């Protein structure tokens, strides 16, 4: 009997030990401005998920700038992601929707939280900080998507932070009533104000996690990239970061063009659609009702968060001139969809738009056949959405600039056609998260991932992507147009797209 009891006790101890191994190891509590937080350990990395950085934007705080947090007592357990911002469930229209856009967590208006991965051993380590801003067309997205996991990147000696921000109607609707009740007399851009609030929280608190508040680099992709550019343009973000990485998206183009007056009109139309008499009634609607009503909302050139004339602001040096890295994916143009147009109509549009410059335009973007027209329109989309804004920003900057083009073609996803180097495909390569993306990866994919992530980490640490025996990446200047082409074998490509850049920039300057 005694032996039987001892055997059972032995196996209970073994079972408990195995169970304990699978539990996240606990950390010492971290003191933030608002109270203590606890996280967990994964190997040498300390992880904190779901740290609040602003008061929940619910009730009367809906459609208001983020408000300060209230202090809490005790220890706030931060070991799982918060709810994702309210949004429509994305239709899986492309091969990456599930991985990049569809939030894995529940949805809630109470979504202003951030996540931290840190390898620091103490608050004195003063490590550089990388802040990730997700994309999703300003209508969807979440910091909880697995492809934005920061553990691998933090193993290289940096602190990785991912942040949530409001999207869609709850993040960007402007309205005359909202403008009147705002101290700044503007409305909309709440999602961008969330980002500023998160950066302000990071500046005040990241030292407790072993970070250096003077060494913050912001980065984002698509709408996240446009957010990065908006923060560079915003006087509200001055001093909150020292470097910026913009992946596939900018605001120095015609893609974003809504001013406050136009945005307020859209808000009035939306209110009428929901048969609400005023903002008070609209605030009483459920978030689900608001989202079901549709609408297209995004950042606004309001003169407060973003300058009314961004191009003029950059041209006159009125922006946060930080060290920058910007680029695009070879297939970014397909984001706007394939446009059908006859060669005759295409050429006439070129004449109508460019006049005596039409001949030069048609040499750069030919349209003699249907196939040429389609290819040229895709190229023009790429230029306007991502490539030209990066080129212009680098030209206006007095700081160091690095430009890239991602052309590596990832392995196919079963059941989908091959999209080539498609919009968003570079993200897991840059963030070192291929292992979280379900594909039959090849050695070349992992080699490109290592190279690209090393470039990114080096830039976060020093403001320079070079080092680690990598292909030398020269600083960008408009005269030579040297661009790092990140393909199977990264190489510096002088003059890539230089003709297109020169022509399109000339048309802007002549307006």
Question: Language-model segments: which ranges?
Answer:
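Bacterial Sec-dependent N-terminal signal peptides
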Residues: 1-27
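Surface-exposed patches in mature extracellular/periplasmic domains of secreted proteins
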Residues: 214-217, 276-285, 403-405, 467-474
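Extracytoplasmic/secreted proteins, especially bacterial periplasmic and envelope-associated proteins
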Residues: 194-197, 201, 227, 262-269, ...
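Non-catalytic accessory segments of hydrolases
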Residues: 2, 26-189, 441-448, 452, ...
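Mobile gating loops/cap/lid regions near enzyme active sites that modulate substrate access
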Residues: 107, 388-511
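Substrate-gating cap/lid region and adjacent catalytic-acid/histidine neighborhood
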Residues: 252, 277, 281-444, 462
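Serine-hydrolase-like catalytic core of hydrolytic proteins
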Residues: 96-279, 314-337
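Acidic/polar residues in short coil/turn loops that connect beta-strands
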Residues: 34, 194, 212, 301-302, ...
């Amino acid at each position: 009997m005694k032996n039987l009891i001892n055997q059972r006790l032995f196996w209970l101890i073994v079972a408990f030990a195995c169970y304990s191994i699978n539990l996240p190891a606990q950390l010492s509590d971290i003191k933030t401005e608002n109270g203590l937080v606890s996280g967990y350990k994964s190997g040498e990395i300390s992880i904190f998920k779901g740290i609040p950085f602003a008061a929940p934007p619910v009730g009367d705080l809906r459609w208001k700038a983020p408000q300060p947090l209230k202090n809490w007592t005790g220890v706030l357990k931060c070991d799982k992601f918060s709810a994702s911002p309210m949004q429509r469930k994305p239709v899986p229209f492309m091969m990456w929707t599930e991985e990049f856009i569809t939030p894995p967590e529940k949805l809630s208006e109470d979504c202003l939280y951030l996540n931290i991965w840190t390898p620091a051993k103490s608050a004195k380590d003063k490590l550089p900080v990388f802040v990730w801003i997700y994309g999703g067309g300003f209508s969807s997205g979440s910091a909880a998507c697995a492809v934005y996991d920061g553990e691998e990147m933090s193993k290289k000696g940096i602190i990785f932070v991912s942040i949530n921000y409001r999207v869609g109607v709850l993040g960007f609707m402007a309205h005359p009533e909202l403008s009147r009740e705002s101290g700044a007399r503007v409305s909309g851009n709440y999602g961008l104000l969330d980002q500023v609030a998160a950066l302000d929280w990071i500046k005040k608190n990241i030292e407790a996690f072993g970070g250096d508040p003077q060494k913050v680099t912001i980065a984002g992709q698509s709408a996240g990239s446009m957010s990065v550019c908006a923060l560079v343009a915003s006087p509200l973000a001055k001093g909150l970061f020292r470097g910026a990485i913009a992946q596939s998206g900018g605001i120095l183009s015609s893609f974003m063009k809504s001013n406050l007056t136009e945005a307020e009109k859209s808000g009035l139309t939306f209110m009428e659609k929901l048969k609400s008499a005023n903002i008070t009634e609209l605030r009483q609607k459920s978030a689900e009702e608001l989202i079901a009503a549709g609408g297209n909302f995004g950042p606004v050139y309001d003169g407060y968060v973003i300058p009314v004339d961004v191009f003029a602001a950059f041209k006159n040096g009125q922006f946060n001139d930080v060290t920058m890295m910007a680029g695009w994916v070879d297939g970014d143009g397909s984001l706007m969809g394939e446009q059908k147009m006859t060669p005759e109509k295409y050429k006439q549009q070129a004449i109508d738009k460019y006049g005596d410059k039409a001949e030069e335009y048609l040499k750069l973007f030919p349209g003699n056949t249907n196939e040429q027209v389609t290819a040229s329109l895709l190229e023009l989309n790429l230029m306007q959405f991502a490539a030209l804004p990066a080129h212009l920003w680098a030209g206006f900057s007095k700081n160091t600039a690095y430009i890239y083009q991602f052309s590596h073609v990832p392995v196919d996803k079963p059941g989908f056609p091959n999209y080539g180097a498609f919009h968003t495909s570079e993200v897991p390569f840059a963030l070192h998260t291929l292992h979280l993306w379900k594909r039959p990866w090849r050695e070349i994919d992992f080699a490109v991932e290592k190279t690209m992530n090393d470039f990114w980490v080096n830039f976060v640490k020093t403001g320079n992507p070079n080092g680690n025996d990598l292909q030398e990446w020269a600083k960008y200047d408009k005269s030579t147009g040297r661009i790092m082409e990140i393909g199977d074998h990264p190489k510096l490509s002088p003059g890539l797209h230089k003709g297109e850049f020169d022509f399109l920039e000339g048309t802007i300057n002549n307006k």
